[in-house]
Design a protein with these regions (language model features):
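Short hydrophobic alpha-helices and adjacent helix-cap/hinge residues
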Residues: 1-253
């Protein structure tokens, strides 16, 4: 059931699932997981594409959920991305961060990014959006003030990457993203979250619950273990970027 990013649709789907007394609910992304969790505390819920289950109040602890919810997290390797940034742009001083102010998972990633950025003497300037219509204005507000832009795994930004790239490409401003899909959309680089892999992890977890081998309340949140570094070929060319020889990577068009 696809809610088409509509909260009322989500609630209707949750009502339908609980009314049908399904054996397990799979939920993709935080809003879906939260709506399903609000609808039932009995039916097991396995979620994916949720950055921090604990921050989203879906579990008591990521290590030991203590609720009917578990799943796979799309928390990106932020420190590894920062290492990549300073390797490619050693003289960078100011980083712009764009994210949705209404997405709690984005706020958590930005909090971590700001803490980690201090280790690299990077100053962070934030530009928040409330919906996709704000993206170009937010991006424009960073032009001339930052050396590059970071976007976390954020549903609002991810749904309108071309609007962001329209501004950054013209300004020759690199964009480092939280997930690989944005690189395909024109962002410069990412140490990529693989949502297909996260789906497989969540599917395996769901199977174990349905087979009676595990219970969500004692099943720790799981994470992607291996990441690929991906660059957008057109962005690299537009920026005149030289990728260091020791950076193992893939180019996408």
């Amino acid at each position: 059931q696809n809610a088409q990013a509509d909260q009322s649709n989500l609630r209707n789907i949750a009502t339908r699932f609980t009314g049908n007394k399904v054996d397990l609910i799979g939920a993709i992304a935080t809003p879906a997981a939260q709506t399903m969790a609000n609808a039932t505390n009995k039916i097991p819920i396995v979620a994916t594409a949720v950055t921090d289950f604990e921050i989203a109040k879906l579990v008591k602890s990521n290590d030991k959920p203590g609720t009917n919810v578990t799943g796979s997290s799309d928390m990106a390797p932020i420190n590894s991305l920062l290492e990549l940034i300073v390797k490619i742009y050693p003289n960078a001083k100011n980083v712009g961060v764009m994210y949705s102010s209404s997405e709690i998972n984005s706020e958590r990633q930005v909090q971590i990014f700001k803490e980690e950025a201090k280790k690299y003497n990077l100053s962070v300037r934030e530009a928040t959006v409330s919906n996709v219509n704000d993206i170009q204005q937010a991006a424009q507000s960073l032009v001339g003030k930052v050396d590059l832009i970071y976007t976390p795994t954020d549903n609002t930004i991810a749904s309108a990457v071309p609007a962001l790239i329209k501004i950054t490409e013209k300004a020759k401003l690199p964009v480092f993203a939280g997930e690989g899909g944005e690189v395909k959309g024109g962002a410069t680089a990412a140490i990529a979250i693989d949502y297909y892999e996260l789906g497989k992890i969540a599917g395996t977890m769901a199977a174990e619950i349905l087979e009676g081998k595990a219970k969500p309340e004692t099943m720790p949140i799981q994470y992607q273990k291996n990441f690929k570094t991906v660059f957008n070929e057109a962005s690299v060319k537009n920026l005149g970027l030289t990728i260091p020889a020791d950076v193992k990577h893939e180019l996408v068009k």
